[in-house]
């Protein structure tokens, strides 16, 4: 086969050595035939290959492969590569000859043909030629993919390539000059003085920090601003070095100069006088002024109050007895101020936040918010003779208890309200001491919510509640308290022999406010104080009803008694008589107190005591006798039923818990 080149009649002759046996044999370069070149009129063959146009063939064989080129680059005429279509082996041999031709210059070689990305810049890729897949060895798949791309652009000259390579080298050098950004470092020289404050200089020659920038950083650091350096007139940029020695030491650590002092730093400050950055305030020592203030300046001086406010919650969370009592007084004052602005409500809503865990009574609560109704620890002294009194609490095993202290605590949904009964001996400092003829008082206090209780027993009130609540306005101002009345739970022969009921009294600055006979206090719970002094609701008392009212009064602080003292008081003075006990199921009651005046209790009561040892199981049912024979004007609070009651409804709020507390 001969290839004729017009018009110069350049002829290529070669011998065919079984090229049509197997196509895959072309992968071996040793199989290729020898090429005989008769005439090479133009030795610079780079123009020949750079001027070839691409013809994308799907089957990988060059059919109708006319490779065009410009006339001025090769010969006077057109360079035409013809094919007689006799056999595909001739076409493959022709392409292989063109690829493997030796050139006098070192520019044309196999690598430059295959790797077109080296011949052309990355910004403008233009592959030189498209060749069949079987013409490339298997060890060069990347070169095959690069050579297989199609393009209609013409080739570029060597001058254009050289210029683009030079531009690419320049861009590469410029990229190398860019330094990697380092990680953010601490801007506080006090927390870590060894690490400098990273500031980008204006000229772009690295990162450094100047003295005036260092002083600005100190003024924006809450660790140094009030202590070592501070603003005197921030709007004018005037600041003072409170501790010049400490500031100079910090600057020395920043510059890695341990012997830095204020004199050396002062010389650097005087340098800024000439630059117009700083100025010395005349007549004042260690006072300087910034000529221009930055816009994004962090203000530290105004954050002193907020820092004190943020430090208050940790103090409140770990408050002692005194701080807890102060919090209670503050919440009481806030409640009393906001009380006359709303309307009264006879229902008590469940708290939104639960305080879980048993704590001493004096530090039961955290500070409540004004918009949430949270039962808090408050004890109210009710006395018919005095309005506002101060309490001096004294507990003695030999004294007769004239007050019964009840505590109620909501433990959230799914659990029962727990009452805590504690006898107190209260001495009035502004009035006569409590005598044995005084009526029994009920001093009530809320106990924080607890998840579990060790010992629990119940008491059933057996007062003959024949009267109903009177519609009367409570005149005593103060934090509103919910008054809950328990109905008569025992009927018929189970009524006490001395049915004289106690008197419920609310003490306040305007004088005591009493409720009519027949009212039994079940719980005093202080609300958020958003309601005014309410009017007590009236309604008939039924055997299965739970009536709630509200009274107001100034809350006092209660006192919890240890369990041993309480047991002695109950046994010696109140003539406590042990009765059969039962274990109370814990967390089995779910009271519903949201706006309901009636509460349906279980049909069978649970009665028990709290000894020091574990409760003994028993199937009997009875009541607890807590009679006080020395009290003449009031009946016994709780009486014993000699026989089991035919109908004794159980109220979840009558759960009573006795817990040992240390005074």
From Swiss-Prot:
Keywords: Activator, Chromosomal rearrangement, Disease variant, DNA-binding, Nucleus, Phosphoprotein, Proto-oncogene, Transcription, Transcription regulation
Extent of Polar residues compositional bias: 582-601
Localization terms from the record: Nucleus, PML body
Phenotype upon changing residue 368 to L: No effect on transcriptional activity shown in IFNB1 promoter-driven luciferase assay
Protein name per the record: ETS-related transcription factor Elf-4
Residue ranges for the DNA-binding region feature of this UniProt entry: 209-291
Gene name of this polypeptide: ELF4
Record-level Gene Ontology MF annotations: DNA-binding transcription activator activity, RNA polymerase II-specific; DNA-binding transcription factor activity, RNA polymerase II-specific; RNA polymerase II cis-regulatory region sequence-specific DNA binding; sequence-specific double-stranded DNA binding
Residues with PTM Phosphoserine: 151, 188, 641, 648
Outcome of mutating residue 512 to L: No effect on transcriptional activity shown in IFNB1 promoter-driven luciferase assay
Tissue expression pattern: Abundantly expressed in the placenta and in a variety of myeloid leukemia cell lines. Moderate levels of expression in heart, lung, spleen, thymus, peripheral blood lymphocytes, ovary and colon. Lower levels of expression in Jurkat T-cells and other T-cell lines and no expression in brain.
Outcome of substituting residue 95 to T: No effect on transcriptional activity shown in IFNB1 promoter-driven luciferase assay
């Amino acid at each position: 086969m001969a290839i004729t080149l017009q018009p110069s009649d350049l002829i290529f002759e070669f011998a065919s050595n079984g090229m049509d046996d197997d196509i895959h044999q072309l992968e071996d370069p040793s199989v290729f035939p020898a090429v005989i070149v008769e005439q090479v009129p133009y030795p610079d063959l780079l123009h020949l290959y750079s001027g070839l146009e691409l013809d994308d063939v799907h089957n990988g064989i060059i059919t109708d492969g006319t490779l065009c080129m410009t006339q001025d680059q090769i010969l006077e005429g057109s360079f035409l590569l013809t094919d007689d279509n006799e056999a595909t082996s001739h076409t493959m041999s022709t392409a292989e000859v063109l690829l493997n031709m030796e050139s006098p210059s070192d520019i044309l070689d196999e690598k430059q043909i295959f790797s077109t990305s080296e011949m052309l810049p990355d910004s403008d890729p233009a592959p030189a030629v498209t060749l069949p897949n079987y013409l490339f060895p298997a060890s060069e798949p990347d070169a095959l993919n690069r050579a297989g791309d199609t393009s209609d652009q013409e080739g570029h000259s060597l001058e254009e390539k050289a210029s683009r390579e030079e531009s690419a080298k320049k861009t590469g050098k410029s990229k190398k000059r860019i330094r990697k950004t380092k990680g953010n470092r601490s801007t506080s020289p006090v927390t870590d003085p060894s690490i400098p404050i990273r500031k980008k200089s204006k000229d772009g020659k690295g990162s450094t920090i100047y003295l005036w920038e260092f002083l600005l950083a100190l003024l924006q650091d809450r660790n140094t601003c009030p202590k070592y350096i501070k603003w005197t007139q921030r709007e004018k940029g005037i600041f003072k070095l409170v501790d010049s020695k400490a500031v100079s030491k910090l600057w020395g650590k920043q510059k890695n100069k341990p012997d830095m002092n204020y004199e050396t730093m002062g010389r650097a400050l005087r340098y800024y006088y000439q630059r117009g950055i700083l100025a010395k305030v005349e007549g004042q020592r260690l006072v300087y002024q910034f000529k221009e203030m930055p816009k994004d300046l962090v203000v530290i001086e105004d954050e002193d109050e907020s820092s004190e406010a943020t430090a208050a919650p940790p103090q409140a969370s770990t408050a002692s007895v005194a701080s807890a009592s102060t919090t209670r007084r503050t919440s009481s004052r806030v409640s009393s101020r906001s009380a006359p602005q709303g309307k009264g409500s006879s229902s008590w809503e469940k708290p939104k936040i639960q305080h879980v865990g048993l704590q001493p009574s004096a530090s039961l609560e955290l500070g409540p918010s004004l918009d949430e109704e949270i039962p808090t620890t408050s004890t109210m002294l009710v006395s018919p003779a005095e309005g506002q009194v101060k309490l001096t609490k004294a507990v003695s095993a030999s004294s007769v208890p004239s007050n019964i202290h009840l505590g109620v605590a909501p433990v959230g949904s799914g659990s029962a309200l727990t009452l805590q009964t504690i006898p107190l001996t209260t001495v009035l400092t502004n009035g006569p001491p409590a005598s044995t003829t005084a009526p029994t008082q009920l001093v009530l206090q809320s106990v924080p919510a607890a998840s579990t209780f060790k010992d629990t027993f119940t008491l059933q009130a057996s007062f003959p509640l024949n009267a109903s609540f009177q519609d009367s306005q409570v005149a005593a101002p103060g934090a509103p308290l919910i008054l809950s009345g328990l109905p008569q739970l025992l009927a018929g022969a189970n009524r006490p022999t001395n049915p004289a009921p106690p008197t419920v009294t609310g003490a306040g600055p305007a004088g005591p406010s009493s409720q009519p006979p027949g009212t039994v206090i079940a719980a005093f719970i202080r609300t958020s104080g958003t309601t005014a002094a309410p009017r007590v609701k009236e309604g008939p008392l039924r055997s299965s009803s739970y009536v709630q009212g509200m009274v107001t009064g100034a809350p006092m602080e209660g006192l919890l008694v240890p369990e041993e003292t309480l047991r002695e008081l109950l046994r010696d003075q109140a003539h406590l008589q042990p009765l059969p006990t039962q274990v109370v199921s814990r967390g089995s009651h779910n009271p519903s107190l949201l706006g309901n005046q009636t509460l349906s209790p279980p049909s069978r009561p649970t009665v028990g005591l709290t000894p020091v040892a574990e409760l003994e199981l028993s199937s009997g049912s009875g009541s607890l006798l807590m009679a006080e024979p020395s009290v003449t004007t009031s009946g016994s609070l709780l009486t014993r039923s000699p026989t089991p009651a035919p109908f004794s409804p159980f109220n979840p709020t009558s759960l009573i818990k006795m817990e040992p507390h240390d005074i």
